[in-house]
Amino acid sequence: MNGAKKMSVIEFKMERPGLLSVGDEVSVEESKLQTLQGLIYYYTIYPALAMSNNIPARNRLKTLEGKVIEIKETESASFVYAEFLD
């Protein structure tokens, strides 16, 4: 094994452009919901800059500190991709 660390990448929707940049260190707040399909989680980049989609419990983040690795701009929103240590 080469000692590489496993990372999870989460997509966040950011409705106001320019709040984050590639390379920014971010903290996320974890929230959970009980649904008919089971427990799901979603994450908000603090302080309310962007929000993730629903994440199944099996894919729950193990750390709440990450780094922005990519931002994709669309006409309606920006999509922020952040990686977190698994």
Functional labels for PLM-detected ranges:
Residues E29-S31:
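Short, surface-exposed secondary-structure boundary micro-motifs
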